[in-house]
Amino acid sequence: AICVSQAITYTDCTESGQNLCLCEGSNVCGKGNKCILGSNGKGNQCVTGEGTPNPESHNNGDFEEIPEEYLQ
């Protein structure tokens, strides 16, 4: 899965994978974690491993949405 837009900063999903994290969607994993895509785009997990870049975090949320213009 290709995670999108390095121009946007993201915070990290939890290492335990209890939070959803969409690659090729509205959210991406941070902190060098990678997404494991679930069925039907649901139940995605963020786990430790190479995959997404290490973007800077600027708040305490688990992830940030990509602005709609990136999703068209």
UniProtKB/Swiss-Prot annotation:
Residues 8-10 are annotated as: Interaction with thrombin active site. Residues 47-72 are annotated as: Disordered. Keywords: Disulfide bond, Glycoprotein, Protease inhibitor, Secreted, Serine protease inhibitor, Signal, Sulfation. InterPro entries: Hirudin (IPR024793), Hirudin/antistatin (IPR011061), Prot_inh_hirudin (IPR000429). It is found in: Secreted. It comes from the Eukaryota. One of its GO terms (molecular function) is serine-type endopeptidase inhibitor activity. Its main location: secreted. Pfam families: Hirudin. Hirudin is a potent thrombin-specific protease inhibitor. It forms a stable non-covalent complex with alpha-thrombin, thereby abolishing its ability to cleave fibrinogen. Belongs to the protease inhibitor I14 (hirudin) family. This is Hirudin variant-2. It comes from Hirudo medicinalis. The lineage of its organism: Eukaryota, Metazoa, Spiralia, Lophotrochozoa, Annelida.
